[in-house]
Curated annotation (Swiss-Prot):
Mg(2+) binds at residue 104. Belongs to the phosphofructokinase type A (PFKA) family. ATP-dependent PFK group I subfamily. Prokaryotic clade 'B1' sub-subfamily. This is ATP-dependent 6-phosphofructokinase. Allosterically activated by ADP and other diphosphonucleosides, and allosterically inhibited by phosphoenolpyruvate. CDD domains: Bacterial_PFK. InterPro entries: ATP_PFK (IPR022953), ATP_PFK_prok-type (IPR012003), PFKA_ATP_prok (IPR012828), Phosphofructokinase_CS (IPR015912), Phosphofructokinase_dom (IPR000023), PKF_sf (IPR035966). ADP binds at residues 22-26, 155, 186-188, 212, 214-216. Its main location: cytoplasm.
Amino acid sequence: MIKKIGVLTSGGDAPGMNAAIRGVVRTALGAGLEVFGIYDGYQGLYEDRIKQLDRSSVSDVINRGGTFLGSARFPQFREVEVREKAIENLKKHGIEALVVIGGDGSYMGAKKLTEMGFPCIGLPGTIDNDIAGTDYTIGYLTALNTVIEAIDRLRDTSSSHQRISIVEIMGRHCGDLTLTSAIAGGCEYIITPETGLNMEQLISNIKDGIAKGKKHAIIALTELMMDANKLAKEIESATGRETRATVLGHIQRGGKPTAFDRVLASRMGNYAVHLLMEGHGGRCVGIQKEQLVHHDIIDAIENMKRPVRTDLYKVAEELF
């Protein structure tokens, strides 16, 4: 059985990452394993920023946002020589397996290490909720609450000024965060990678709302789809109603994780250690229908696709 494991966080931070690290560390120590923290993601792995952790290392972190191990984007990890150096550093410390917490880019790094014979377990840590093989990612529901709070505030001022507001929400190529934020925040319109934008229909809907006496409208837009400020100008020109864009940006990644994310992250961290002790490597952890599951990490990246939430889009359409 393995005796030493490492844990790192990579890519964009997400609330609950610290809880996941804590879950890994406390479970491993309780099972008699040694645990090493790799600081600043794959870059720290390459540069040998590796330190042994104990119980006190993860005291009072469960309620903190971000990741105390730090994170960094490190595109050089695509290079074989860089990964070979990383594995050399792991072996120098006697580390036999690695838990990687992050998004799809982090999973790709874990996949590459797995293909080179070093066992890794991936935990889905991203607010985008865009990882295949899991219903929820660590940090997604905390970010949802953050976005809803912002939408509530925008609604107050938009109503006061009879204004149309566009709120740009993170998610990259996945509209889950935008979709659920729009439903929970009572937005009038939604634009995601899954729905696209029918400008003619959008303008028609806004004009219909104005004719019915609506004082404001909130439009939820997934980032990277289009320039939010340009869209605001086009809507204002077409409707005659003042329109402003608000880009929430990185505020969505911060803040204390919700109870759900703390429990989810703790469960996933615990589960990852048990998988490694049972001899499983090259896996990624998810939660599906409230049950923890694990999938082949290569298959998850190359073949598995996240299902489009057609049920929620139907709800959104009927409510808007």
